[in-house]
Every structure is written in C-alpha cells, then in structure tokens.
UniProtKB/Swiss-Prot annotation:
It comes from the Eukaryota. The gene is Col24a1. It comes from Mus musculus. InterPro entries: Collagen, Collagen_superfamily, ConA-like_dom_sf, Fib_collagen_C, TSPN-like_N. Residues 573-599, 699-708, 923-944, 1056-1074, 1175-1205, 1323-1339, 1371-1386, 1434-1444 have a biased composition (Low complexity). Glycans are attached at residues 157, 366, 396, 448. Residues 506-561, 577-636, 679-738, 742-801, 802-861, 886-945, 946-1005, 1006-1065, 1072-1131, 1135-1189, 1191-1215, 1220-1279, 1316-1375, 1376-1435, 1439-1498 form the Collagen-like domain. Residues 512-524, 776-789, 912-921, 1485-1495 have a biased composition (Pro residues). Belongs to the fibrillar collagen family. Residues 1534-1733 form the Fibrillar collagen NC1 domain. This is Collagen alpha-1(XXIV) chain. Residues 312-324 have a biased composition (Polar residues).
Amino acid sequence: MHLGAYRTRHGKVSPTTETKLFLRFIVLCVVWISVHAQGQGIDILQQLGLGGRDVRYTSSVTAVPSSSWSTPLPQGVHLTDFGVILTDNAYIESPLVNILPISLRQPLTVLIGLQSFKVNNAFLFSIRNNNRLQFGVQLLPKKLIVHVGGKQTVTFNYSAHDERWHSFAITVDHHVISMFVECGKRHFSGETTSDVQTFDPHSVFTLGSINNSSAHFEGTVCQLEIMPSTAASAEYCRHLKQQCLRADASQAQRNLPHTAGMPTRHPAHTPLPRGFPGTDSPQKRFTEQDSLPKGFDGTELPRETFADGKSIPNNRSNGSATVHESQEHQTPRAQLTSFHSGNISAVTLPNYRIQAKEITTKEETNLTLSVAHHLPSEARMNEEGRINPLFAGFDNITQHEEAAGLPLPKKASSGFAHTNQDTMKNLEKALTANLYTNELIEMERILNSTLYRVMYGPSVDNHLELRKEGEFYPDATNPIEGSYEPQAYDYYSYEDYNAVLDMEYLRGPKGDPGPPGPPGPMGIPGPSGKRGPRGIPGPHGNPGLPGLPGPKGPKGDPGLSPGQAASGEKGDPGLLGLVGPPGLQGAKGLKGHPGLPGLRGEHGLPGLAGNIGSPGYPGRQGLAGPEGNPGSKGVRGFIGSPGEVGQLGPEGERGTPGVRGKKGPKGRQGFPGDFGDRGPAGLDGSPGLVGGTGPPGFPGVTGSVGPAGPTGPPGAPGPMGLSGSRGPSGIKGDKGEQGVAGEPGEPGYPGDKGNIGSPGPPGIRGKSGPSGQPGDPGPQGPSGPPGPEGFPGDIGIPGQNGPEGPKGHLGNRGPPGPPGLKGTQGEEGPIGPFGELGSRGKPGRKGYMGEPGPEGLKGEVGDQGDIGKTGETGPVGLPGEVGITGSIGEKGERGSPGPLGPQGEKGVMGYPGPPGAPGPMGPLGLPGLVGARGAPGSPGPKGQRGPRGPDGLAGDQGGHGAKGEKGNQGKRGLPGLPGKAGSPGERGVQGKPGFQGLPGSSGDVGPAGEPGPRGLPGIAGLPGEMGVEGPPGTEGDSGLQGEPGAKGDGGPAGSAGATGEPGPRGEPGAPGEEGLQGKDGLKGAPGGSGLPGEDGDKGEMGLPGTAGPVGRPGQMGLPGPEGIVGTPGQRGRLGKKGDKGQVGPTGEAGSRGPPGSVGENGPKGARGTRGAVGPLGLMGPEGEPGIPGYRGHQGQPGPSGLPGPKGEKGYPGEDSTVLGPPGPPGEPGPMGEQGETGEHGEEGYKGHMGVPGLRGATGQQGPPGEPGDQGGQGPKGERGSEGPQGKRGVPGPSGKPGIPGVPGFPGPKGLQGYPGVDGMSGYPGKPGLPGKQGLLGVPGSPGRTGVAGSPGPQGGKGASGPPGSPGAPGPKGEQGLPGQPGVPGQRGHRGTPGDQGLRGAPGLKGQPGEHGDQGLAGFQGFPGPRGPEGDAGIVGIVGPKGPIGQRGNTGPLGREGIIGPTGGTGPRGEKGFRGETGPQGPRGQPGPPGPPGAPGPRRQMDINAAIRALIESNSAQQMESYQNTEGTLISHSSDIFKTLTYLSSLLSSIKNPLGTRENPARICKDLLSCQYKVSDGKYWIDPNLGCSSDAFEVFCNFSAGGQTCLSPVSVTKLEFGVSKVQMNFLHLLSSEATHTITIHCLNTPRWSSTWADGPELPISFKGWNGQIFEENTLLEPQVLSDDCKIQDGSWHKAKFLFHTQNPNQLPVTEVQNLPHLGTEQKRYIESNSVCFL
C-alpha cells in the first residue's frame, strides 16, 4: 500500500495513520517470533481454532485460544472445562501447512489426552495426501494402531474405549514407533520395514476421522500436541495441560458438554458481571503463572496511574473490519489468533477518539458508536431498539459486547452469526452496490491490511479478561431481540473519515441526534475482486427463543398408595439448557480454594515406642467366595455374613416327572403378610369371556340449569336405541358380606356346537399346590454320606468380667504426647543482624504513550506492486466410497386376476375382539317431565361400607357411672417392659444369718495380696530333732491359693449405697403364679387423646329423621382409594342367547397349531399369472434338494393366506443368525420323588444375625382375625413431647373422581327470613311419608356472639382426636422379647387371581442343575443335509455316498443319423409379417400360399446367415424373368416367410433369453426380468455374451430375488471352474455377493484369537481380489456357529458367512493360518455355493 493513501487534505500524515504504520511493524515482529516459537510443541487444537480453557504460553507471545466469542465452532464441536468434545457429526479438516510447519522432521512425539464415549474403529486424527494415508492414529475396541504410510502399521494392545481419561505419548523415530503410558513408566515399541516418510506439504489434516463417510471419534480431546523431539516422551506428564490433569482428577464425576468461554483472571477492584467465568467456581481461575506470559510479573496496575483517568480503548476484530470499543472499568485484554488461519484482526488504537457517522437503515433507526476517553454508561438506542453495527458490510465483522457503554446486542455479534440468510444476502447486495468508490476501497484496504493484534501498553499484557457471548455489564443497555435488514447506507469517504479523526481534539458540547438523512443513490457495481483466502468457520449461533409450551400431556398413572412413593432412579442427563439472560452484577466472590499443598516437611524426631495396644475386636466375616472344586472335608469354619438376595434366575428346564405324592393335610392359615410395594403392571392377559353389561357410569358434573322450555307435546315412542357404550369400569368396592346362596337357575337352552377352538396360549404358571400328605414310611434306606458341616452359630453374649488379674509388668515408655498449647507471647527479642544486600529489582513497567509527535512529512508514492502468480491447482480429491445400494424398485403392475380357486374350508373361529372404546359423550338431553311420585320402595340391600367420617365433636361431660360388677379374672398379661430405676428404698431390717453355703469350686489364682499385719506369736512347739544342715535351696515359686476359709460372722449393716445404674436387661423370668384380685383403684385422671379406635359394628337402622332443607347439589367428588378385591359372587343364571354380534376386528395371531392331516392331491390347476409377492407361505411340497438360499430382502407382508394341507418337505433353509423369540415357559413338571434323607450333619455354630431381607411381595388379603382377649390395663404412659413439624409432603397427583359421597347431615339452621305475607289457611293435609335424609345444607352466616354461659360441669373423656402430625423418627429401640404366638386365624377366602404381571427381566444365569435322568426317546428327527465328502482316512467302514458330480461337458458331435420317417403335421405357426405386393404376373393373381409345412430340424444360424439367405433369394428372384411359373413364385414366397419367421424367433430369443445352453442369459436376474414365470433351478448363463460355447451352468435362486449361485468344483475345494473373464463380468453385473464356508474340525479350535494357544494368529480367509477377511477388522466374517472350541473327541464345525457389497471380494479362494494338525486332530473345509445378486 502506498503511503499516499494516508495523506489528509492538509498534506500531512494524520497521527492515526502514523500509529497504524508503527503497529504494523510490531505485528510483523510478532509473526516472526511466533514462527520461531513453534519448536517447543505444536498445539493441534490451538492451530485448528479449538483451544479450550487451558492454554499454555510459549515465548513472549500471549496466546489466547479462539473461544465461542471470537471464532465460530464447527458443527458437532463443543467446548468444555476439560477440552474439546467431538460428536458423530463433527468433521474438521484443514490443510497440513496450516497446522504443522513444512520443516517438521523426525524424530517427533505426539502427546494425546482423551476420553472416548463410544466404541468404534475411528481415527483420532489422520494426515493423508489424495487417497494415500501418510500418518494417523486409529482407536480400535482393544487396540491402538499407528499408521505411518506405505500401508505400514504398528499395533499396540491398548484399550482407550472405556469411558475413562487416557494420556499417552507416541514417538516416531525413523522406523521405530513407540508408545509411552503411565507417565513414561511403561512403553511399547514396534518397528516398520522402512523409515517413516516425511509429510507432504499438500496433505490434509483431519481431526476425529479419516474422511467424512467413515466412523467418527466421539469423545473429549483435552490435548493433541506434536513435539519435534522424543526427549519429552519419557516424562510426558510434565507437558500435560492443566485441563487434562483436572479431567484425570475428576474421573468419577463427568461434566456434560457445554460451551463456555475461557477462564480469566480479574483484578480485585474490577467488578465482574454475574455468570462471568471465574466467578462461578474457583476451578475456573488461573494462577498468574498460567495466565501471564513469560517476562511479566503478576502485579496489577491501579486505575489512578492512567493519566487524566483515561482508559485504553480496546479494539477487537476477527475479520476485515473492527468495532472499536472502550473499557472504562476494566483492563483491556489481548488476542492472538492462529497464524495460519488467514484471519485479519485489527490493532489497538490508544487514546484517540473515533467518531463514526450515523448509519441509516430502512427502518430509519440511528445509532452513534464512538470511542472516547469517557463514555456514558448507556448508549443511546432508538425507540425500536434495533442496532446497526459499525462498518457493516465488510466481511467477517466481529463485534464484542464487552465494552462499557456500548450495548452491542447478541444479534449483531460474531459477524452477523444470528441474522438469517436473507438478511445476509440483502446486506451483501447493498455492499456490492455501495462499495465502488475509491474512497471506500481505500478504507477497506486500510482495515484489511492489519494482520494481528498487538498489546499496546503494559496493562494490556498483564491482564486477560475474556467474556462469554451474551454477557453484558449491568450499566449497559441489554439487546433487543429482533432482526434487522440494512438496505441503504450513507458512507463517509476516506478523507472525511480522517478529517473526523483529526478533529477529535476539538471537543464541543454533544449535540442532539440529527434527523435521518435521505438514502443515498445506488452506487455503480464495483469490479469483482480476487478470490480471498478461506475464512475460519463462523461462531456458533445464539440459542433460539424458547418454544411455546407444548400441549398438555396425558394423565399419569395413579401414584403408589399408601405411603410416600420411593425415590425414582436418577434420570438421564437432560439436554443442554438455553443460555440464560445476563444476570445482575454479582458481589465480590468468595474466598478462593486453598492453594496447592506445600512441599513435604522434614521428618520429625522419631517418637518413643508406644505400649502394646489391646487386641482388637474380631473383624467381620468376609463375603462368601466363589464356589470352588469340592475339596476334602475341612475344619469347621465360621459362618459368613448373609449375602444379598440375588436376582431371579432364568426359569429352568422342565424337570422329569416325579411320582405324585399323597395329598397332605390341610395347612394352617398363614398370618396376613405386610402390604408389599406395588408391582409393575402385568402383561395383557388372554382375552376373557364377554362380560355382562357393566354398571352405569358415574353421573357427570351437574350442569347449570337452563331456562325451562315450553312443554312440548308427548312424542311417539322412539325406536329401540342402540346399546350404549360401555361405561368405565367401576372402582373396586369394599369386601361385601357373604351373600345368600342363590337359587338354582333354570336349565339353559342347549347351545350350538362350537367350532374346534385353536389351541390357546400357554396358561400362566399356576401357583404351587399345597404340600401333599406325608407318604407311607419307606423301607430303611442305606445310611447316607455325612451331612455338610453346620454353619457356625452367632457370636455369644459377652461373658461376665473375670476376676482381676495380677499386676502387669512395667510397660514401655509411651510415645511423646501431643504438642502443648501455644505459649504466651515472649518478650521482644534483640534486633537481628543486617541482612545481605538484596538482588537487583525487576525492571520497571513500560511508560505510557507519549504525546503524539508532530506530523511527519509526506512520503513518496510507492511503486505499483506486481500481480501475484496464479495459485497451483489443488490436490485431487479422494475417490468417493461405494454408493449405497439402491432402494427396492417400485412395485410392478398388478397382474391379471387368476382363475377362481376352489372353495376353502371353513376357517377357525377367531378370538373375540377387544371391547370397543367408549363412544363420545352424547349431548345433554332435554329435561324430562316431572314424574309422578312413586310408591315407597322396599328397603334396599345393605350398602357398601362408607368412608370414615370426620371425628365427632367432643361430647358433654358424662356423670359418674355406677360401679360395675366384679369381672372375671383376666388372663395373665404379657410381661411388661422394664420400668425405670426406682428410688432407693428404705433401709430394711437386718436379715437372719443364712444357711451355710456349699463350698465353692476352686477359683483361679488371685492376685497376691498386700502383706498383712504381723500376727501374734504362736505357742512354742515341741523341739524337733536336729536335722542335717542341707544346702541352701533356690527361691521357690509362690504357692497355690489356699482353700477358702469358713464363712465369717455377719458384719454390721453398712450404710445405704448410692443408687446404681440400671443393669442390663434381664432375660424374661418364668411366669409367676396368678395373684389375688386387687381392689378397684381410684379413678384416674382423664387420659390424653387416644388413637382412633377400630370401627365398631354397624348399628341398627335408625329411625328416619326429619327432612332437612334441600342442599345445593355437590360437585363431583374425587375418586376414593381403590377398594379391596371382593369375593367373587356366585355364578348367575344362564342368560338367553344373545343376538349375533358385529364382526370383531382381526384377532391376534394365535400360536401355531398342530400339523393337519395329509390331504389328497388335487387336480393340477391352470397356470395363473404372476401375482404380487405374498408372505412366506407354509411348507411347500417336497422338491429336489437344492442349494440353500440366502435370506432375501424384507418385503411388505401380504395378507395371511388360508392354511393349506400339510405339504411335503421343502428345501432346507440356510441357518439363520437371528434368534427367534423365546418360547413360552414350559409347564411345571410333576413333583419328583422324595430323596433319601442324608446323615445328620454335625451341629454348626450359631449363625450371625441375618441381614434383613428385601420386602416380600404383597400377600393376599387375610380375613380379619378374631378379636383377642382383652389385656390387662397397662400403666399410664408419660405424655410424650410434641414432635417437630414434619416436612410438607410433595403434593400427590390428583385422584380419579370418587364415588358420590353419602348424603350429609342436616346443615345448621339458617338465618331467620323476613316474615312473609299471611297466606290462606290450607286444608289439613294427610300425614306424609317420612322423607329421605336431605343433602347437606348451605352453612348459614355466623351468628352474633352470645353471652358467656355459666361454667359447665367437668367434661368426660373426650372422643379420640385426629391423629397428630407424624413425629420425628425415634431412635432405634432394643430388640423386643419374642412375643407369644397369636391365635391362629381362620382360613381366608381365596382371592381372585391377579392380573398377569409384566414380563420379568431376564434373571442371572442359574447354577448348573443336577444331572437328570435319562430322557425318553425323542421323535425321529428330520433328515439332515447331505454331509461333505470326507478325506481319505484310515481304512475302515465305507463312507457315505459322495455328492453327485457336475454335469459333464458336451460330447463331440455325433454322426449324421439316418433320415427318419416323415413327421406329422406341425402345429399352426404364428402369423407372419405382411409381405410387399409382388409384381403382377401374366397369368393373373397367384393363389394364396399353402400352409407352412412342419419345421425342419433347427440349425445353429445367426442373423447374418439369415439375412444373407434372404438377400440371395431376392437376387435370384430378380434375375429370373417374369415368365417363371406359378410354382416358382410360390416356392420363393415360402422361403421368404420361413426366413422371416426364423428371424422373428431369433430376435425374440435374443431379447428374452431362455437360459439354455444355446440361448444363455447374462445372469439369473435377466431371466427374472424377462420371464414372469420362472422357478428355481439350474440354468445356463454367459456374462460376457460372447460365443455360447463358454456358457456355464449355475443355480438360479429366484426366491431370493434372482441370485446367481456358482457351485464349487468339489465340496472340499475352493475352486469354481469359471474363467477369470467370466468371473470379472459377473462381478461387474452384480451389486452384492454371499459365500458360506464350513470348517469341520476334530479337536482343533482355531477361529478366535482368544482361543489360540501360543503365538499363532487366528485363521483368515483370502478373497477373490486378494483382500483378507479376519477377526477384528472391517472385513470380519459373520460367524453363524462355532463349535470347534468343544474338544470332546467328536466332529464339530464352525460356519462362516461372507456377505459384502463389493462382489470383487468373493468367492473365498484360500483359508490361511491353518494350524498344523496333531495326531488326534483332523479337519476339512466345506465350501457352499457363492451367490451374486
């Protein structure tokens, strides 16, 4: 750009232009530094513009990653705290030169940190040139493959698909590829055959896949970095990013994908808006070392240091134009985008005012954007709230909403990311029309020439402050939602723009906004510019507006009852919510998390050895280990803690029928079980019988009374109405009382004989029957083996404390005690010595920008630059993948109707259809006439038990009742709970001395007593004889404890001791004798409100009350709770035969019935036209055994045909890989014989207390038990403390409408009405019948407060009050004493069978059952397919007959036979073509040609020969004169017609091949297309349509869509006897191919690598084109069955299916990696036909 463009009208360079030139020089320096800073490592994610929150800085350049506010993220890419999330639709591709420098050479290290979400075979990244892969890392399910070009790969057994975080390093050093894991502690290496090639500069780098159509990596990538050395691989953890370390630390908690900005460090004095990253959580903050580049300290610059309070304007841009912003309360931040992305970012203009003119849109809305030293807190916005961006119209305009006072809306940010496409198109049209003048082009060159942002001033470098998109400061005006379409603009010329810049020092008062100017004229379209560089992807759009609320959902199922429902399982993570509006400015953040732990302190002095601790308690018994092999009988062990209840196992096979046991005695009625949790809904049961007419539905809500209409004439009786829709099922009522036995019904009419019903579905498994009666005692069996060792018993109660032991030895010195408390502050010490001279301080900050210097002289005009060279042609794109198989063709035209079939047999009656849905609610009928009063009805049956009424009011105080008669002595009550410790009793009288006790047993040696006082001197004994002086003896041990002395006299009574603590609870004592009847005690004080008592017996029918006032009709009540299932009523009388119902809908398909009897062969019918493809019919008649067909495409199911007679056996079908649904559960086998009783095992230890089991299933409702005997009156309990107010429960779902309530009691008396006019005295009426009880009246208004009454007498015990709110759960009580067994209740009624439950989840695999008895002989199986031809084995039994050989080649042509006799007259030929009119003969018209004779023997004649014969005959006819005889003309006409007939048949045979050797087809599908009546069989084909001599015979499977199946030369050989040319043509004419290979093996497991022993590889298969089918690859064959792993000395087989969309890969020509056979190992390979379609 020449400098002349910067001159102003005054001939000088403006300060702004001079600043821009200076900043460009700085930008070039930054670019040069960044290129040399790449040697430390290339961050691939940063280069792709996907830098996350964690950024490490290199050199002196502050790298700020492109986040959601500066660079648009590609589709399928999300940013999170831990890195970049790639989804399945993410596709990121970039030229390699934009990612890696061209000078990158080996060795190099790839540092990777990732977490995978989905298991697949995707590439993490790939580098490819055209269709050649140069380098890539592929993640397989259990492997990691490094591709290094030249089809060289190195595989590592490393699994990264486990949803965990992995970090590893891969080094490439010439031909050695290594992988380092666990921070370099482990590594694996592999070598390639040649050195790894260097990268081509024209290559393409792809992240997450190898191309767009292959599998995509789905997961999070926190680091992908390439280092140009291998030194960092051994300690690669030192180079991991912080976000990788944080992700590894938070392995347990996974964050959902979300888009976030960068974490930012903020100064303490800067208020941050709510929601700003860094204020949410302490994890989002950076330390100064992380957020500042090298060379800067962490000190902050106070606001006062800015001269005159000026803040540095901050300009940001990511494209060709810049929106200038000013920050008044924040520190500006710098930005450095990717050096290779081609972006253009504007530079910072400090301390200059830029005043932009108003931009006018078609809505006549104005906005003035300015950058100044001081900006108002709010920008002015017009009344419509729409904002037009500054410099709108340039490419890639980026606006940021961070500047204080510039309310830039989200709609205007990120380069119009949120305007629709029409708006952008209109904007481009307007710009194209308006940017033609030289001034605007010059301005665009100025704005487009700035390359990178440079930090100007120290405050720019010290602080980074990034904001997420959509956040605003509280003093800014929030954006108005809406769109804008700028149409016409009023642009300044370049000189005017600089004039505005020069006038910034002239500060006048701010004027009022002027009126909008008129739209400018349309500019001349400018010349089309050169194609610019490809821009980086735009930012993500803001979330859309929330949608309207959806329709109300269906009513949910009723909740569980009773009790509060259990907490549901945690739901799946919800979708990412919309970005909320910016919140208000938050307060100062909380104190940050504590810093990293300090360095490890020095080791303290070792403490003294401590005393030996007391032995610990025995640990808990561990869980039971897996069941091992039965070992020898071990020592009696302790019982393990009971394990958790396992899941229900799968239902076992039906057991062998046992001997039916004798009927056992009737068991006792069990106790009613607890109410279990409500089980899941059961499966739909089998259709029940048609029920009777249901009860009428509930009455609807009474509508408002309409005006009374005129009384119409009585209408004629209407016709019989249709039966109403069935009402909803009524709520189950309470259990009714036992009804009176009904009278026997009248004998019904004999019903019609019904059709034979189809076998019903298998019934629900019945409940286990009652245990049978004990059988007769059997003979004494042999003694069984000793039983298993019993479980150890529970740990016993701790015994009593033993006697005090002897005094122990002196213990070791204890450890040092804890440090003492902090002492008081000591006196101030003396002044210490002077310290050393400090190091030199850091250089001071860079000074502020000086005053602008004088304008420089005008520069010289620069030379015109040369035109750039045309770029090289880009690399050729990769070849596309094979297209998807075409959809199935349209359905063919309908064929002509076939002949009428014979009358079918009468079908089986279908299942009764389900009851129809209730019809719509009919319109409200007209009010009927008031009927006459009916006669009083008879008393109705006993009503159902009503709901519990409200608690009655407290009754009046009752008088003292008379003393009752002495009651019978009650039964002994249960032992009471232990009472509290009583107060110390009075000192008792000293008792008499007791009897002498029995001598106690010798106790243990007690502790040595203290020496007693010196005893009295004893009486001197007789002198003994003088003994010999013996040697001094050793010191003897202490003697044994002496026997206890006689009991001494009783001492004086001691003083009363202190009250002891309550002892442990004693065991329940023996029941005492019944005491005497005590006297009646005094009447106690009235007790507290008791719990509500049980409902009493229903009272007798009361007298009818007086009729109350008519109450208002109540609203429909809520439905009551579901009642208890009542006892099934008695069977009613047989109803009359109803009318014939309507034909119900088609019932569900029943289970397959037994095969019918073989019918007689009917006459052969005429051949019908080809109909539409129907469903798979029943088994057809037995045909010749053909080649197994493959599974065809899924067709639309046709209507089910009538069941035909049992056909003969058809072709054996191919083994299907899809398992059928599991069969119904088998019937329970009969009870087996009772086993012999084993020997009594040794008594085991008492087991531990068992873990409380899971709550059992809900038992049947037991009958109410008989009332128990009345217990004795318990002691008065203390009044409990009032429990805390319970938490308010979650409001339950609204219940169903309840049964109409019982008519209420008469309401209170209403207010006295005004006195009415005296009426005429009426005649005395007859006494009326007592009326029914009226509804609850309307409550009257409250009356006046009455005078206080006299104090009433003391009230009696009030009625039970309502139950209080549930108190807080009390502490767990001690285990209660075992209660006495209750009175056995009566046997309850048998409950109604419950609904069939849902199908249970498949249980765990059960333990293998015991070996069953030998089963009965099974039915004769179907004949299996013909076995393969065996190898030549040892001379033994003659093997089975081999397969039929192929049809031999055609033999040589035989000699010409003798002329046979004259054949009979042939059939009439087809009508020939009409010939041309011949020349008129001299003898008049010739007679008509005679009928053609019998056709001669067919000869091989082609079209050329026929035409040649025709031409020769015509030429001969022309040579003859017209005087030929009539016979000559007739003979010529005959030859012509014969030739034409042959030509017609020959053309027809070419168009419609017959599949014969003389007229072969290309492939079998041609026969299916040309002929509509073909059947499966052998046909001849010629794929290249050459000479018919190279045609070959194939099997055409038209049932599978026209497959062409080639049989191998031999079953045991992989050869097919077809030339390569024909096979290539067959491949070209086909779209898919299948091939099945079976390996018969004897003790040779060789398919899966998991079964392979040793270093041998699993077997693989070589296809026709040389590709290899093997395990864990994309060409892995489908294993239909694999029994070769069974090595039991019998033949087994492994069956493989090869199905591919690339026919060139089949047939399989070789089986590789077959192991060497041992002495007892054999195998052979069986090849089935290969079929092409």
